């Protein structure tokens, strides 16, 4: 198969608008390959929730390839070794792929390049994951951006992203190499099956991504600008897991949104705000390419001296949604039961962990990494550091979300909170977010016994806020070389 090439799928599990796959299709026969490399990423290998999504996404990708007369070859093992094996088995020479931006991607790609060149071919990498390549967006002085707003403004001054491309025709090899059976990878949990019912909430795959985008733009985007912060309302796109696995491209989102804006000019403000959230994803990748250690180390080095606390019981209470603060507990339970959490609530629970409990942002980052379907290395690291105060363009240290006020403001009717914290379902609105202030008769009428049916708060808000401000004040005395 001298004219055969491998297309190496990673976090680009789609067929449309995939420049690398289009290029491979023009080179001759194409062997689509996905490699499950369990060691890749080290501490940041795929979390449990992401593995569930990957299983279903690969199922859909394999079916989509069969529909156009091709196949998906599945292999498990160390990436460079597996690709070397496939090149030898098939006689293919070239390896095509989409660019990835994780800190380990360059080293892996260098290894793939060497084995491809040893086979007499080349490793050919194409954009396809971001709207703008990080090295192309620079300040007037030629340096990388460190603040989001001017970064996104600079992006919007660039030429518009190219139009999305359709699914290419793929020429199959004369003989297909062996493919492993997806089920043997055991990506989905069994005992216990903590993902029970997720298949009724989510439809992984390229078609599911397209449906999610179109549904959002047709039915919900008009309320996005003013309503995106209200977790009980379906005003957000929920596209993040699809984007994480590359089942839809940023260009497809960009142009579908631009077309929607032309059809409905009155919704332009909401659509622009939505696209700025795509911009935040771009910014996070921009930052991680500058500072590859960001998932593990503070962007602001002063925070390496912050007096973080260790308290196993408080961490467990936060993880399990038993802090005694209803909006916090609602969010953490939503995360565990669905693999997702509304963005406003993500900010509130992150602030609570880092500022009320003074626990290291890495504790939250790691928990989200394992539990979120959309756990993206760059976005997860940047967002946690933003809330914790150590990141680029970070939230000010004195911005400490009040979990009572946040619940009262963004879930005033309590629909979201009562759904995820059903033991408080009968509590009147007045006391829903501070049940410890409710009279005993009110608690009894609602069937609530604090400390038994629902926990007492693990910290006092006012005291925790003052302690956090004192802790952050210590950084003023840290002298950096």
Q: Locations of the language-model features?
A:
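Trp/Phe/Arg-rich N-terminal binding region typifying the photolyase-homology
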Residues: 1-163, 270, 379, 462, ...
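Charge-dense, low-complexity intrinsically disordered segments
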Residues: 44, 48-52, 200-207, 318, ...
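Glycine/tryptophan-enriched, flexible segments
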Residues: 142-298, 302, 410-411, 415-481
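Active-site-proximal binding-pocket segments
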Residues: 234-429
């Amino acid at each position: 198969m001298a004219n055969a090439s491998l297309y190496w799928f990673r976090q680009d599990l789609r067929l449309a608008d995939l420049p690398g796959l289009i290029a491979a299709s023009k080179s001759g026969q194409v062997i689509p390959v996905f490699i499950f490399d369990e060691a890749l990423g080290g501490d940041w290998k795929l979390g449990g929730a992401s593995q569930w999504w990957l299983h279903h996404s690969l199922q859909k990708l394999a079916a989509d390839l069969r529909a156009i007369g091709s196949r998906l070859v599945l292999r498990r093992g160390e990436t460079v070794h597996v690709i070397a094996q496939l090149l030898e088995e098939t006689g293919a020479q070239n390896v095509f792929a989409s660019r990835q931006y994780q800190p380990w991607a360059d080293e892996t790609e260098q290894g793939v390049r060497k084995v491809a060149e040893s086979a007499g071919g080349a490793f050919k990498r194409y954009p396809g994951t971001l709207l703008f390549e990080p090295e192309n967006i620079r300040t007037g002085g030629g340096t990388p951006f460190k603040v989001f707003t001017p970064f996104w403004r600079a992006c919007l001054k660039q030429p518009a992203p190219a139009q999305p491309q359709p699914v290419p025709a793929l020429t199959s090899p004369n003989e297909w190499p062996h493919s492993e059976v997806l089920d043997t990878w055991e990506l989905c949990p069994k005992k216990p099956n903590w993902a029970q019912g997720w298949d009724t909430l989510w439809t992984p795959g390229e078609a599911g991504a397209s449906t999610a985008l179109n549904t959002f733009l047709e039915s919900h985007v008009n309320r996005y600008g003013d309503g995106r912060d209200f977790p009980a309302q379906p005003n957000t796109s929920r596209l993040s897991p699809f984007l994480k696995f590359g089942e839809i491209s940023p260009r497809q989102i960009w142009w579908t949104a631009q077309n929607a804006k032309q059809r409905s000019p009155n919704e332009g403000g909401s659509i622009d705000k939505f696209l700025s959230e795509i911009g935040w994803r771009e910014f996070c990748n921009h930052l991680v390419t500058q500072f590859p250690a960001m998932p593990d180390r503070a962007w602001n080095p002063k925070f390496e001296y912050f007096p973080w606390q260790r308290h196993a019981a408080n961490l467990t209470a936060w993880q399990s949604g038993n802090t005694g603060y209803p909006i916090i507990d609602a969010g953490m339970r939503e995360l565990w039961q669905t693999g997702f959490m509304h963005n406003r609530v993500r900010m509130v629970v992150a602030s609570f962990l880092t500022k009320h409990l003074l626990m290291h942002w890495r504790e939250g980052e790691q928990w989200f990494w394992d539990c979120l379907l959309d756990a993206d290395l760059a976005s997860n690291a940047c967002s946690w550091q933003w809330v914790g105060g150590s990141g680029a363009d970070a939230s000010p240290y004195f911005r400490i979300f009040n979990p009572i006020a946040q619940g009262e403001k963004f879930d005033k009717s309590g629909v979201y909170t009562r759904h995820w914290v059903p033991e408080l379902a009968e509590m009147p609105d007045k006391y829903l977010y501070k049940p410890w202030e409710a009279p005993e008769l009110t608690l009894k009428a609602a069937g609530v016994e604090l400390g038994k049916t629902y926990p007492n708060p693990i910290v006092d808000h006012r005291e925790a806020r003052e302690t956090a401000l004192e802790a952050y004040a210590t950084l003023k005395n840290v002298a950096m070389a």
